[in-house]
Amino acid sequence: MHTCKSLLLTLFIVQFVYSTEKIRFKSPDSVLIKQTLDSLLSDKNLMALHYEILNYNDEFKEITYQPLYVSYDVDTVIINSNENIKQSYLKHVAKNFSDIKIDRKSNKNIEKKKKTIINKYYFIRSTPDINVFKYQREKLGLHVDINSTFNNYFSALFGGTKAQKDRWEYNGEIDAHFENVWGAMEKLIFKWIAIDSINQKFNFELHRPHLIKGGMGLILNSNYELVNNDYVQKKYDLKVELLNSFYGSFYAGYTQGSINATYNGKERGFISSNYKALAFMFNNNSLDDMILPIKGSKTNFELEIGEDSNFKNLYIKYRQDFERYFPITKNINSCFKFYAEYINAFNNDVGKAREVLFGGVNSLRGYDNNLFRSPYVSIPTFEFHYNGIKSFNSLVFFECGFSKNYKPKLSYGFGVKKITNNALINIEYAIPHTAPINEAKVHIKWLTRL
């Protein structure tokens, strides 16, 4: 009983002195002192924290300890991945931790580093396990376990409709997505979309988190688009990563493009032009999953400042994509999405060919693809998801499109998404607000996982 009272009294004193960062003991009980200090060290979980004797009286009836914070350099960082990534690229991942010191702020700094690599690397969606270890007596190292998730898939859909008596219109889509094919953490995307024979789009993207020597990130984009047989637009983008931290990644680069109006397009007021611009991008990604996210957010902001052969002054263009997932209950979560795009030529009309096209599965569901055209558009979306069944997601959504040339466009609908080891199936049924139910659009996407 006496021991319990002493321990409770000591804990009370420790708790009181803890706020002042000094600890006083009333007796030279070495076992009690060791247990108390070990407990405090365990609670704070700081390797850099030690306790040293500050003072004591002649009879050892009052002993005072004070915290001592030291600083250690990390000599070695070991990165372990569950996927096959080349060591030369894992070394670049390790560099994210090279400036860490084991000191008073090490726990906070390690948490920031965890957020940094989740933001930078699209294939890391869960928090890495990080442990500090000792080797060769006095040297310290970090062991980082990353859970890499790469998605490789391919889909191809084709169809046809008889537009006239002896003429058929074809449509289709090819979507090829490859990740870490060469063990370099790269991402390759190829898309072909044909709404009909006079509306087609080809797109190629290459994402490299690191180049072999310099280690900087790179994004390359090439785009070809035929729009209603009025004009052909070609566009090329190159962006390099300038800065990466726990709050986001910053890119800068160059954009160049051209618009070639057809004879039919010129008759309808479309004008050929060439343009070039400086491009800037900010990206942040904390989603817990790239296919079926439940929590986290994703932000992408792009800005162009450049010149066009049809404009006397500079033009500015920006695009913003944002999505945030909020868990409501264990199996239900809400999602808010926001898409906006804007172009403005100072003291000039931007022209129809440079306006923003929107409508369809990726921008205002329930309407035909690229049905609308405007200098700016913003589309907020609210979704509610049910994910009580593993690898299965159902949703209802409401979205509205705001633009300069049209009244607000509303749509609503529901959908299901199913993931198996071999495929991903996504079906959405979307209805424009003013349309009867039989004019709804069914958006179907089938991906074969490789």
Identify the residue ranges that each predicted region occupies:
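Sec-dependent N-terminal signal peptides
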Residues: 6-14
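C-terminal transmembrane beta-barrel domains of outer membrane proteins
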Residues: 27, 93-97, 297-450
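Gram-negative/organellar outer-membrane beta-barrel architecture
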Residues: 104-300, 356-361, 370-376, 392-394, ...
